[in-house]
Amino acid sequence: MSAYLLTAPAKINLYLEILGDRPDGFHELVMVMQTIGLYDRIEVRQNRSGDINLYCQHPEVPLTASNIAYRAAQLMMTRFADIYARVGGGVDITIEKNIPVAAGLAGGSTDGAAVLVGLNLLWDLGLTQPELQTLAAELGSDVPFCIGGGTVIATGRGEILDPLPDLDGIPIVLAKYSNIAVSTPWAYQTYRAQFGEHYLQDAASWRTRMTQIHAGGLIKAIQQKNIQAIAHELHNDLEKVVLPEFPQVQQLRDCFTKHGAIGTMMSGSGPSVFALCETLAQAQALKVQVAQELNDPALDLWVTHIASPGIQADFR
């Protein structure tokens, strides 16, 4: 039966600032989000059973409706029930999991985005990227970004996207302790408890701050593709609560700096940390140096690069 194979990239945050509390209970955010060259692969295949069947060999990936990929299929089947009924059958979703789980890299969100793109193609729905991103926002704050990828300034909950010039090819080293997981709700709730008194209190103040960030140093550095300046402007509010709670993450960050990373930061709610490098050779050397110094079997390291594409699909 017909199938599509999709590549679904991880993301890092080059910037994350929490502005305040929204009426819907979420935080108002300003982020610069960036896809990287570390991918999950997802096969979306029509079946005759009428069911959603989710397959993945990774022991930490749930095969139930708690998985965003599963919920993405449910959403498409519900929203396009007439087309689903005409097509007949269900869908088999097979995930090859290469992106670390619970790592602040949008691994679950990008899989959900891939299922949306795959079913759009499989059922010949003809949805545009903005239409897919509107659906994606119902699944999670990072999912709309994962559809298109690239370099983007994201506001609201993260679903309002404004493209920036691509930064293709900048080498990075990515690192995560496999024995550390950070709960995203915990990170944001702890930040609120510790720093909520400093939140901006109204939408007008949020807009003013967003304008300042749009005109600020990081955006200018991205427009100029100035790696040194980008590294200088990296910022993540959630480091204020995660690093004190997880000293190994702080140690990892410090180790990257010690061995010459141009810039280093935790991505999202962590615990993944990335380091920007000038050249691939520097990135490869940095990976070896950090692995040797920390000498921890639970520490996983990857050499990869900044990459612009979001979800990519091939017919099988």
From Swiss-Prot:
<dbReference type="GO" id="GO:0019288">
    <property type="term" value="P:isopentenyl diphosphate biosynthetic process, methylerythritol 4-phosphate pathway"/>
</dbReference>
<dbReference type="InterPro" id="IPR006204">
    <property type="entry name" value="GHMP_kinase_N_dom"/>
</dbReference>
<feature type="binding site">
    <location>
        <begin position="100"/>
        <end position="110"/>
    </location>
    <ligand>
        <name>ATP</name>
    </ligand>
</feature>
<dbReference type="GO" id="GO:0016114">
    <property type="term" value="P:terpenoid biosynthetic process"/>
</dbReference>
<dbReference type="InterPro" id="IPR004424">
    <property type="entry name" value="IspE"/>
</dbReference>
<dbReference type="GO" id="GO:0050515">
    <property type="term" value="F:4-(cytidine 5'-diphospho)-2-C-methyl-D-erythritol kinase activity"/>
</dbReference>
<feature type="active site">
    <location>
        <position position="142"/>
    </location>
</feature>
<comment type="similarity">
    <text>Belongs to the GHMP kinase family. IspE subfamily.</text>
</comment>
<dbReference type="InterPro" id="IPR020568">
    <property type="entry name" value="Ribosomal_Su5_D2-typ_SF"/>
</dbReference>
<keyword id="KW-0067">ATP-binding</keyword>
<comment type="pathway">
    <text>Isoprenoid biosynthesis; isopentenyl diphosphate biosynthesis via DXP pathway; isopentenyl diphosphate from 1-deoxy-D-xylulose 5-phosphate: step 3/6.</text>
</comment>
<protein>
    <recommendedName>
        <fullName>4-diphosphocytidyl-2-C-methyl-D-erythritol kinase</fullName>
        <ecNumber>2.7.1.148</ecNumber>
    </recommendedName>
</protein>
<feature type="active site">
    <location>
        <position position="11"/>
    </location>
</feature>
<dbReference type="Pfam" id="PF08544">
    <property type="entry name" value="GHMP_kinases_C"/>
</dbReference>
<keyword id="KW-0808">Transferase</keyword>
<dbReference type="Pfam" id="PF00288">
    <property type="entry name" value="GHMP_kinases_N"/>
</dbReference>
<comment type="function">
    <text>Catalyzes the phosphorylation of the position 2 hydroxy group of 4-diphosphocytidyl-2C-methyl-D-erythritol.</text>
</comment>
<keyword id="KW-0547">Nucleotide-binding</keyword>
<dbReference type="GO" id="GO:0005524">
    <property type="term" value="F:ATP binding"/>
</dbReference>
<keyword id="KW-0418">Kinase</keyword>
<dbReference type="InterPro" id="IPR013750">
    <property type="entry name" value="GHMP_kinase_C_dom"/>
</dbReference>
<keyword id="KW-0414">Isoprene biosynthesis</keyword>
<dbReference type="InterPro" id="IPR014721">
    <property type="entry name" value="Ribsml_uS5_D2-typ_fold_subgr"/>
</dbReference>
<dbReference type="InterPro" id="IPR036554">
    <property type="entry name" value="GHMP_kinase_C_sf"/>
</dbReference>
